Amino acid sequence: MSLHAQLSPEAIERLHKQRRNSTISSIVIAFLSITLVALVLGVFLLPSLVKEVPTIVTYESNLDNDNELVEKKVQVSTNRKPSSPSSSMSKVIVSNTSSPTSVPVPEVDVTNPSLDFGDGDDFGSGWGDGDGTGGGFGNIPATMKKRCSKEDRLARLQETGGTPECEEAVVKALRWLKKTQKSDGSWGGSNQAAMTGFALLAYLGHCETPHSEEFGDTVTRAILYLINVGLKNDGRIATSAPASNHWVYEHGIGTYALAEAYTFCSKLNINFPDLDKVTIQAGDMIIQGQGESGGWVYCFASTNSGDNSVGFWQIQALKACYHTGLWTDSKLKKSGRKALEWLEKAQGANGAIGYRGNSGQSPGLTGGGVLCFQMWDAGRSRNARSGVKYLSKNSDFNWGEENANLYYHYYNAQALINHGGVDWEVYNAKFRDELLKNQAGDGSWNQSGVKHGPVNNHMATCLATLMLEVYYRFLPGTGAGTK
């Protein structure tokens, strides 16, 4: 026998409703649980799937605070991975405070420019006619970026009369300079701004920038040293006393190097605090120091004459300033035209250009005058052609003799490769191998005892290096593309 309780219809209905509510609650709880699990997984997995975008921080210098210039000192630290100077960028940290700010630069590809060379009619067609485009070295002016890949350098060497040995000698020299750099970034026991400027130009001539694996730290410290010299002296890039004759040489050479460094750094998005400020101050000092004649003399004194040994460095510096974009073109071109007016007066009937107005005094400076004409759009002028004719007859190069003075041939090599043709081929055959075989085993050159020549091994090494870079360096101020 069994007993069964009979439920009322109302109780049965309540039971069914309770079951329905329980089912709905179970579904809702399950959905919420799945959603919660998905959110937790997303928190942990999402960061690994999203590429982090670096925050770029740059330094904004205070141009109005003049009272701190003497005490202000720029500091730098770098962190770079192995790379070639022409193929990839590394991270550079630049700051003037105790907390460095980072300027990351992406890796870029470098395009190879044209390899056409001169036809003997002043300028070769391969000297570029405008700024590059794109990132990295593509932004470098066309007349400068051809030095920025090893493949292009070797191709230019072959096209213009160089050899692979020239490239090897340059690298050996740059390594010697790296070893001899002082802890403060300078070189030399005296006239350090000039000696540092020479070295920096040699590095930049090989496209060694703060990004370079082997020489990046060396270049960075050299730039910072020159910036600090300028900050301490209101834009005067010199360690010599203002009353000395030497400081104007230092200033021209140092300004030339800083301006070219600024062009590279600005195009590569490398920010050195106060580099622009010091470059502008230094360039303005050259413009203001130009005499009524168009020339420059010791101490930038007022003059109706000109000291061409001093003036040539100012003219080269102003052309480098032109490429920075920090001035209006008209201001710099006006100064350049005035300088050429003086050189026209100083040039002799035979094409020679000497120390001052007397073309017969130190006519070895003729190459510098020709280079200045070429820099400021007068490479096809009668004056430039006359100077080239003089050089073609008076540019022997016998190491150990006075005619091999590297100070003069630094100019001759640039002037004659710009001109191109047979004149360049003949001259190149005179100096190239002589220079190569007289490099010391440590990478340096010594030309002591040569009258009016390099004052020390450092200067001789820098000038010789710049001569061997002439095949691909293409100074910012040379070539048809600099107009």
Where are these regions (language model features)?
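Membrane-water interface at transmembrane helix exits
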Residues: G42-L46, Y322
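Strand-loop microenvironment adjacent to phosphate/nucleotide-handling motifs in alpha/beta enzyme folds
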Residues: M1-S2, I27
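Membrane interfacial helix-start segments of signal peptides and signal-anchor transmembrane helices
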Residues: H16-L39
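Intrinsic-disorder/low-complexity signature in envelope-associated proteins
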Residues: S2, Q6, E10-I12, L45-G161, ...
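An alpha-helical repeat/solenoid feature that recognizes helix-turn-helix modules
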Residues: D131-K172, S186-T218, L231-D284, Q288-D433, ...
